[in-house]
Structures are given as structure tokens and as C-alpha cells.
Amino acid sequence: MNIKKTFTLTTLIGFYCFSFLVTKTSARIGESRTTIQKRLFSSGGAEFREESSVNNKTRGMPYAKYEEFFPKSTEIRVYHKTTDGSHSKLSGSGWELHVLYVNGVSELEIYKKSQKITEFEMIYLLNFQSSASYWKKSQESESPAEEPSAFGFDFIRDDEKVKAKKLGGNSFMVYSTELDRGFAEAMLADLKALAPQSVEGF
């Protein structure tokens, strides 16, 4: 995969819009679980299957607070991949990948690294999700009231179908705009319904 080597993330985020050279037109968000796992496992990745391990790793994740609003067909899978592509033993340094599938299709992915994610790795992660489009950096001038958002975002794809957000220095989240909006609207409706009872008696 060719990437403009003269660009660094520091340079890129200084512009409102930026694009990447891509060789694949299929994005990860929107892919089936079968496709994602085939690619991941062929690169040495493995899946956490023990329920206690999965529960421990999903606790406190951004998507966890919206669990009550998950569609019935939702599955959460957690994977581990080494940085050098060697066979994962589900421990040690490397990456954790959290994927929220709805009807067997990826709608949210969190990439969590045991060390800080480098600017070059972040470029690749965004590049993987470009789908022949390009990414725009979030602007403070954008009104958050324009559309409900559960997670907010640091980047949005030009077709507005996918958003991305940095989660500290070692994690990065990518998710569909539809899922983000759906969680936000469900939460707002729930809060609205609870408000009368909450203030009753004042």
C-alpha cells in the first residue's frame, strides 16, 4: 500500500480535509464478520472466547454505556493481534480489536494498542477505512446540535457514512454514522421519558 511519505499526521491534521492513496475500495466498517476474521486470523490474530476475559476487556469501553440500546442482532467480539504478525497467544504486546457487529456486519471497531499508536499507524488505520473517499478533521465551529451524536468525532469521512475518534494515546475508534446517531437518539428519548418522574414533587 502506497502512502505519501512526506505526510505526517501532524501535517495532515493542520488541514481541514486530507486524503490518502488507497489500493482497496472495501472499508472495514460494513464488512462481514467472516471477512474480518479471515483477514485477521491469516495475520496471526486470535479471538478471546472466555466469557470472563471478554467481559473484563469490554468493561468501560465507549460502547458499553449504550448496551441497553443494542439491536437484538448485536454481537461484540474481541481479538488480539501481535505487531509483527506472529501467532497470537492472547497475551503480551500488540493490538486488541473490539468489533461490534449488527446482523453480522461491522458497525464499530476499536483498535487498542499496548503502547502508544504512532502517527504512521493512525494514517494506516484511517486509510483502511477510506473506501475510495477521504477524511475531514472535525472543526470546533461545527455545531454539535446539527445531528445527535453518541460518541462525537475527531474525523468524518467525506461521504459522512463513517466517523473516527481518538481515545487517548493508545486507542482509536471507527464507527458508522448511522450507529452513532441511533445510540444518541435512543439515549435522548430515554432521558426525555424519565424527566417527568425525576422532577416530580419539586
Residue ranges of predicted features:
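Residue-level detector of intrinsically disordered, flexible termini
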Residues: 10, 18, 26, 163, ...
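Bacterial N-terminal signal peptides that target proteins for export
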Residues: 1-11
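Short helix/turn-capping signatures at newly exposed starts of structured segments
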Residues: 2, 16-132, 198-202
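Non-cytosolic coordination micro-motifs
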Residues: 105-202
